[in-house]
Amino acid sequence: MKNVTDSFVSLGHWPSAGSFGFNTDILATNLINLSVVLGVLVFFGKGVLSDLLDNRKQRILNTIRNSEELRGGAIEQLEKARTRLRKVEMEADQFRVNGYSEIERERLNFINSTSKTLKQLENYKNETINFEQQRAINQVRQLVFQQALQGALGTLSSCLNNELHLRTIRANIGMLGAITD
């Protein structure tokens, strides 16, 4: 490992006029490293996030379609209830004298129950959409945080080792010794 490090150190001392060399100054290259890591995270994370969001969008759209089908069924039931209402109204004309008030109550009950069912289905659809959106947002946040944390830990573990620490400490001790002399 020391030979490899020494070879990189010797590469860092190439003449700078018109040639390519390695910059071993950690403070000068840290900004470049961070920008490279962020660029890699954006480049590779974008596809994962878009796939995740597309899947979540499909689920939400499927939920909306299911809710719309339920709504269509409720509308169909409403139409059936209306036809029954018409039938009941025809019978009401025949029995107006005896049972008009009872028929009117039945009609109102049909309308109220159908209206209540439609409202419940609409509320269920809206709650499902909101829940799926919040769940998708939370999953995306968690995924981005995990990827950023893994990238940062990978960068730290690849950049730091014991030999580099010891060399940095020795260099700093040497500079402090030179300052105090």
UniProtKB/Swiss-Prot annotation:
Sorted UniProt keywords: ATP synthesis, CF(0), Chloroplast, Hydrogen ion transport, Ion transport, Membrane, Plastid, Thylakoid, Transmembrane, Transmembrane helix, Transport
This entry's Gene Ontology molecular function terms read: proton-transporting ATP synthase activity, rotational mechanism
Q: How does it assemble?
A: F-type ATPases have 2 components, F(1) - the catalytic core - and F(0) - the membrane proton channel. F(1) has five subunits: alpha(3), beta(3), gamma(1), delta(1), epsilon(1). F(0) has four main subunits: a(1), b(1), b'(1) and c(10-14). The alpha and beta chains form an alternating ring which encloses part of the gamma chain. F(1) is attached to F(0) by a central stalk formed by the gamma and epsilon chains, while a peripheral stalk is formed by the delta, b and b' chains.
Q: Where are the transmembrane segments?
A: 27-49
Membrane topology of the entry: Single-pass membrane protein
Report the protein name in the record. ATP synthase subunit b, chloroplastic
InterPro entries noted in UniProt: ATP_synth_b/b'su_bac/chlpt (IPR002146)
Instruction: Enumerate the subcellular locations listed in this protein's record, separating them with semicolons.
Output: Plastid, Chloroplast thylakoid membrane
In which domain of life is the source organism classified? Answer: Eukaryota
Its predominant location is: plastid
Q: Other notes on this protein?
A: In plastids the F-type ATPase is also known as CF(1)CF(0).
Which function does this protein serve?
F(1)F(0) ATP synthase produces ATP from ADP in the presence of a proton or sodium gradient. F-type ATPases consist of two structural domains, F(1) containing the extramembraneous catalytic core and F(0) containing the membrane proton channel, linked together by a central stalk and a peripheral stalk. During catalysis, ATP synthesis in the catalytic domain of F(1) is coupled via a rotary mechanism of the central stalk subunits to proton translocation. Component of the F(0) channel, it forms part of the peripheral stalk, linking F(1) to F(0).
The similarity annotation says: Belongs to the ATPase B chain family.
Q: Which PANTHER family match?
A: ATP SYNTHASE SUBUNIT B, CHLOROPLASTIC
Q: Does the keyword Ion transport apply?
A: yes
